[in-house]
């Protein structure tokens, strides 16, 4: 997922490059450039209603007021964008989801999965355990797709260099191949 917060879209070139990459035999990649097109256009964290979509999922949801930059919306899945993500994830049941954010420069996973740790090594970012905020897409995915892994890649502020994009593409492809039981070195 390239961009759930409209002002954190450095993942878009990674998604674009993955789309241009050769397919990995035996792997189905679903690439979503932006979950938040209104926020992306306005360069805001929230959507057109000012809701932080990554606080609008039902797992551990709690109401966060509209005055906060982390506004959760009036109820879980109140926003059309989070409902679309829910429908996609429910339909596709991905075994692995990677969510790009900015600007903390790390890879985070509450479960400390080997996939997330390997991703961090490939791209040269620190791995940190994720303290999961309320109502996040990653927590919802893990709770609703049996055996699913979902983690956060926090990119640096500003655009990525061509070299950085290539590293992230390699890391995504390695994670996808590994998740499918393939030899990551061959992909």
Segments from the language model and where they lie:
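Active-site-adjacent mobile loop/cap segments within catalytic or ligand-binding domains
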Residues: 109, 135-187
